[in-house]
Design a protein with these regions (language model features):
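Metal-dependent phosphohydrolase cores
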Residues: 1-129
């Protein structure tokens, strides 16, 4: 995402309520989430919705559901949402980008799971293989 677009997004979020912020970020995922990552047959939008749905079905808190929905927002903020697989070779730490960006607008109960999701996934992959 280009710097001017990020600044425009920040301006919208700064003057928005928590519900409006969530809606604005959902629009970003809806607009930019049409590409797929890795070798999966699923788009970023589908992945975000699946994660949030699983969290809801497991009776997680609203904050955890929000984290589940926005956990890969960093891919979009760093421009890794353009069907390029460059990020597989050049880690831009999308989890830290998203957590840092969202920390201005959401509590730690939302941003901490986002920050930790990559490390958690790597751990699970290592013990389940």
């Amino acid at each position: 995402m280009q710097l001017d677009k990020i600044q425009s997004l920040e301006n919208k979020l700064n003057s928005a309520s928590i519900i409006e912020r969530t809606n604005v970020l959902c629009e970003i995922i809806d607009q930019r989430g049409s590409c797929s990552f890795y070798d999966e047959e699923i788009t970023q939008l589908q992945h975000a919705l699946q994660c949030a749905t699983l969290a809801k079905e497991n009776n997680e808190s609203d904050k955890f559901i929000t984290a589940s929905l926005f956990h890969d927002l960093g891919h979009m903020l760093t421009g890794e949402d353009v069907n390029s697989h460059d990020f597989l070779n050049n880690d831009k730490y999308h989890e830290n980008v998203a957590a840092s960006f969202l920390s201005k607008y959401f509590p730690e109960e939302v941003t901490y799971p986002i920050k930790m999701h990559v490390i958690a996934k790597r751990y699970l992959c290592s013990v389940q293989s």
